[in-house]
Amino acid sequence: MTELKAKGPRAPHVAGGPPSPEVGSPLLCRPAVGPFPGSQTSDTLPEVSAIPISLDGLLFPRPCQGQDPSDEKTQDQQSLSDVEGAYSRAEAKRGAGGSSSSPPEKDSGLLDSVLDTLLAPSGPGQSQPSPPACEVTSSWCLFGPELPEDPPAAPATQGVLSPLMSRSGGKAGDSSGTAAAHKVLPRGLSPSRQLLLPASGSPHWSGAPVKPSPQPAAVEVEEEDGSESEDSAGPLLKGKPRALGGAAAGGGAAAVPPGVAAGGVALVPKEDSRFSAPRVALVEQDAPMAPGRSPLATTVMDFIHVPILPLNHALLAARTRQLLEDESYDGGAGAASAFAPPRSSPSASSTPVAVGDFPDCAYPPDAEPKDDAYPLYSDFQPPALKIKEEEEGAEASTRSPRSYLVAGANPAAFPDFPLGPPPPLPPRAPPTRAGEAAVTAAPASASVSSASSSGSTLECILYKAQGAPPQQGPFAPPPXKAPGVSGCLLPRDGLPSTSASAAAAAAGAAPALYPALGLNGLPQLGYQAAVLKEGLPQVYPPYLNYLRPDSEASQSPQYSFESLPQKICLICGDEASGCHYGVLTCGSCKVFFKRAMEGQHNYLCAGRNDCIVDKIRRKNCPACRLRKCCQAGMVLGGRKFKKFNKVRVVRALDAVALPQPVGIPNESQALSQRFTFSPGQDIQLIPPLINLLMSIEPDVIYAGHDNTKPDTSSSLLTSLNQLGERQLLSVVKWSKSLPGFRNLHIDDQITLIQYSWMSLMVFGLGWRSYKHVSGQMLYFAPDLILNEQRMKESSFYSLCLTMWQIPQEFVKLQVSQEEFLCMKVLLLLNTIPLEGLRSQTQFEEMRSSYIRELIKAIGLRQKGVVSSSQRFYQLTKLLDNLHDLVKQLHLYCLNTFIQSRALSVEFPEMMSEVIAAQLPKILAGMVKPLLFHKK
């Protein structure tokens, strides 16, 4: 009992201040209770009497002990006997280790520590939280592994380890080993049994604060099933967070909210690996985050990062335009709901972040972006305008954006899906690596989906519909897409359009992004084409004459007479009666040409030599009519040939399609050859394929420009866009009649037209300027001719100078019509995707055939191998140089398209589709130009 005399050297209590636990803690018990009633001095009793003391639930809490403290004296004696037993064992161990401290000093320090811990003051008015009441089930592990565990001698209590080991310091007589044991975590506990310490200095002592230990601000609690052993290190490591100590222990400890351990440590469930969405820490402190998280990710917004756009430049252009759209994109969640379907992520509720701009695109800083973090192609774009995804081959540095596919649905098997708003997506599966998402769809689905997703209007025009009435059934005919619903992939800034969508918008009609086009009640997909080629004659009425069902695409003959121009006069457009003077003409133009050539009339045009010659106005200007006859190739020497014979032409086309050596014409070619005559030259034979190219050459197209009003930049650009729309339609019609082009896959046909439409237009501009005005002006159309003065007054003078180079090259090289026609076809075939075409073999055969035709056309004028080779080099070099020239036009066109609202420039529908879908790819180098010569 001599240990109580060691209390004398303690620091005296300050009068008027709060009671010091180091001074009064040994006597904080009721008088005449306990085994030491006679050792209490009289001078310390007044101190104790002024302090409210509550020992209930502190020394031996009911939830942990399971016994009723009715006999307080018995309990106190049992508790102190247990402590003395623990002390005696510790003394024996440490005495054997050769401790330098004297036994009385060690005895005093050990018992002081135990009593100070067990008899700490408690009460409802206490300002600082007391240590938790429960203790571990093992023995009093106060000094590390030196104490052997003795479960029968220890109280059967559980809970968080007492903050005794975080005490700042003891009295001066304590040994160094004891002080060290108060500061560090006992090494006797295994890492799985080490319980949480307070994150700051111990709140139970009024001494010097202890440096906070680097504990995590959020602790992941791993839930496990099964019962716990009695000697477990504490239930907090297993199971759900719960209140510590129960209700009985609440009187001795500060109130702790559920899920928060002692010291303000938050307990959060471990993040489920099935959910890829990032979680946000429930407690945001300056302390380091839990292991595995970035130290910077301490706030809610640190987990939200702007998604890294892949190097798919078509996506880059679409995303850039969406960010520039003020009205529809800056609206936050409202704008996002208009473009993306609602998410149903299981972790959405745990991340209440109002960031509608980037749904499910956030990822932790220390992790890689999810493969499916960019659902732009199928989530927010209109179905008819989805960009055809292009892989860059084995060396692709980015993962292609993949759309979310409903499990079990094959987009290739449902061509007639209703196009309503996309359904909510199922819960996201674990992220897959690049290439795994492509396995979910069948290999054949890629061809059909890409065909229906790129160039819907072009697909309408390439397939001529029969106008069959829809099938009758118990339901009404499904609603069809409005004729003028905008087909623009990039959401431009509400620019006016010449299509019917502008009139609908002006009338106040609500813009519907996904008009219903469902058939047969099939499930819907967000990226199916908005054009149903069969059973819907009301789709695209302006292009109805150019549609046809798919059944006609797989006819057995390689070339059919229906694919050729019908019997239409190439001069006036009337019904042709046969091939007269080498050209398919009507009887009226035949007689006119014969009389004009034999009578040697000198006709003069009252206008500008650009009069319209058609069935009604063919007699208005004989000069322009005769000029058109000569341009078509009519000569008097060709009258000896028989009338147009369908069988002969089909046989000739089949012969041309087969690989043949140059200069060895067969019988079919000889029968279908015709003469051409020009001053100073002999009569020469024209190859049949070139003759056919002449017959299918489109007529001059008018721009509809009003020359009575002063020119403005917006009016000129709008007129050029309208002209470009008509010329694009003419290119599609021309390509349909092109021998060999219909043998290609429909996707390849659309791709080739989209890649080469600008080259064909500027090449035709150069030819018209060369033929009509000798390259002195830019002959866009008969009603839109720009001289140098008008070029300077326009806002695209530098662009006009660029386009002016082509007619000047024509003048320099004196290009013939036969050479021009062959070069024009090669321009259609000079750009392909990086991965190639679906029907690559047929494409290469077709291109080789037209290269041979160009050699034949060169041989019509050039005599000798050397001169023909030089000519071939000059013409093919001109084709190669067009790539760089057209790239400047592409860039200007895309910039004008993006700024169309600010510039007040209108873009028609089909032209908008092509610009938005393919120009970003072309400018980004995602296409492969086919060059004749190396640079």
Curated annotation (Swiss-Prot):
SMART domains in the record: HOLI, ZnF_C4
Modified residue annotations for Phosphoserine: S20, S81, S130, S162, S190, S213, S294, S345, S400, S678
UniProt PTM: Phosphorylated on multiple serine sites. Several of these sites are hormone-dependent. Phosphorylation on Ser-294 is highly hormone-dependent and modulates ubiquitination and sumoylation on Lys-388. Phosphorylation on Ser-102 and Ser-345 also requires induction by hormone. Basal phosphorylation on Ser-81, Ser-162, Ser-190 and Ser-400 is increased in response to progesterone and can be phosphorylated in vitro by the CDK2-A1 complex. Increased levels of phosphorylation on Ser-400 also in the presence of EGF, heregulin, IGF, PMA and FBS.
Main location class: nucleus
Domain of life: Eukaryota
Region described as AF3: 1-164
UniProt region (Disordered), positions on chain: 1-254, 331-378, 418-438
MF annotations from Gene Ontology: nuclear steroid receptor activity; sequence-specific double-stranded DNA binding; steroid binding; zinc ion binding
Covalent link (Glycyl lysine isopeptide (Lys-Gly) (interchain with G-Cter in ubiquitin)) residue numbers: K388
Domain NR LBD per the UniProt entry, residue ranges: 681-915
Compositionally biased tracts (Pro residues): 418-430
PROSITE patterns cross-referenced by the UniProt entry: NR_LBD (PS51843), NUCLEAR_REC_DBD_1 (PS00031), NUCLEAR_REC_DBD_2 (PS51030)
ZnF start-end (NR C4-type): 569-589, 605-629
Cellular component terms per the entry's GO annotation: cytoplasm; nucleoplasm
AF2 as annotated region, ranges: 689-935
Family: Belongs to the nuclear hormone receptor family.
Domain notes: Composed of three domains: a modulating N-terminal domain, a DNA-binding domain and a C-terminal ligand-binding domain.
This protein's name: Progesterone receptor
Organism, as annotated: Pongo pygmaeus (Bornean orangutan)
Name of the gene this protein is made from: PGR
